[in-house]
Curated annotation (Swiss-Prot):
UniProt-listed Enzyme Commission number(s): 1.14.11.-
Top-level taxonomy: Bacteria, Pseudomonadati, Pseudomonadota, Gammaproteobacteria, Cellvibrionales
GO BP terms: DNA damage response; intracellular iron ion homeostasis
Listed cofactors: Fe(2+); L-ascorbate
UniProt binding sites for 2-oxoglutarate: 168
PANTHER family reported in the protein's UniProt record: PKHD-TYPE HYDROXYLASE YBIX (PTHR41536:SF1)
HAMAP family, per database record: Hydroxyl_YbiX
Protein name stated in the entry: PKHD-type hydroxylase TERTU_2553
Amino acid sequence: MLIVIDALLAEAEVLKWRARLEDAEWLDGRGTGGTLSAAVKSNLQLPDTSELAINLGNTIVQKLGVHPLFLSAALPEKIYPPKFNCYRNGGAYGTHVDSAIMVMPNKQSLRTDISATLFLSDPDSYDGGELEIETAFGAQAVKLNAGDLVLYPSSSLHRVTPVTRGQRVASFIWIQSMVPDEAERALLFDLDQSIQSLISEKPADDPTLLRLTSVYHNLLRRYAKF
């Protein structure tokens, strides 16, 4: 399930943060990949401990924490502090899969159920740089407007194509969901979106709406794992 969240960051916010990112000190991203992924990785990465990474990361997490579409699709239990990368001068990231378990800065373990990319560069400012995600229906190429975010299963093989002009700056994020099974999560998402559409049409005490809401929460109770 690929979900696009439009304008998680407003245009003015993107411009402010991007100006700061352009002046940031970027490091070789290969030092942060696993053995296999490092061999196909050619990008730059912002140090996790930099003030800029922490401040912008906190802003992103705060935005996600109150976004209805994100909450509905991800059902988040834990969010790894956002990281930031930059691709330029032919930089790319070959086909790889994200590690199943990450250790967060607070030493807690996080199971990567959902991955997210938040685009911070305007798509017409660079060539290449598509996020290609392997799905059951073939590879899906994603290149969004600055401020837009895409969610996709962490189990997916994916890659970033070479950036041949300009630079592509983005944030990447991992989420542990309360519902680890992708199919169960997709079912809950579809049901929740249907309920949300009915809320605008029916009174709060409508029997059909109440039954559907009850079904949703009983399924969530069955599927959720802590």
